[in-house]
């Protein structure tokens, strides 16, 4: 498994962090992608542009069979190198399982409208069926690579 995960800090830490999907979560300043408090957040674009890009490059170098991108959203809106790296990954053959914010954000719209992307909307009504839907799509995608 390649790619990245983003996750909140351990209570009372509200900040958001990023780590490679294949490593344990890290709560270090160099992994912090956004500072949050109860009312607002302050993203650190340079962390996406350095660590985020590095994680995606390492995933390619080590030829991971599946990339995780959890999640893509508004924190990355000024992380142009990271955006470019994500879009390059979409051109590759490696399947990607990602979570994309629904909000209309130009760089996310580029992902949502990409010809290699299949969106699976999740709602309260269908969320119990989503794991089997994802498994079916990934199984089909991985078979194409063999």
List each model region and its residues.
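N-terminal phosphate/diphosphate-binding loop that engages ATP/GTP or pyrophosphate donors
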Residues: 1-39
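Residue-level preference for the first positions of well-ordered beta-strands
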Residues: 2, 64-68, 95-97
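Phosphate-binding/switch loop-helix module in NTP-utilizing enzymes
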Residues: 36-88
């Amino acid at each position: 498994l390649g790619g990245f995960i983003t996750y909140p800090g351990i209570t009372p830490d509200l900040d958001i962090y990023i780590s490679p999907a294949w490593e344990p979560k890290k709560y270090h300043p160099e992994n912090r992608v956004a500072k949050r408090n109860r009312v607002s957040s302050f993203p650190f674009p340079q962390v996406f542009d350095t660590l985020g890009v590095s994680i995606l490059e390492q995933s390619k170098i080590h030829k991971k069979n599946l990339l995780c991108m959890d999640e893509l959203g508004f924190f990355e809106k000024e992380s142009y190198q990271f955006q470019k790296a994500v879009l390059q990954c979409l051109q590759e053959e490696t399947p990607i399982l990602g979570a994309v914010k629904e909000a209309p954000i130009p760089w996310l719209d580029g992902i949502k409208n990409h010809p290699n992307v299949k969106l699976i909307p999740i709602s309260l009504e269908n969320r119990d069926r989503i794991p089997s839907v994802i498994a079916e799509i990934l199984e089909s995608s991985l078979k194409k690579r063999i």
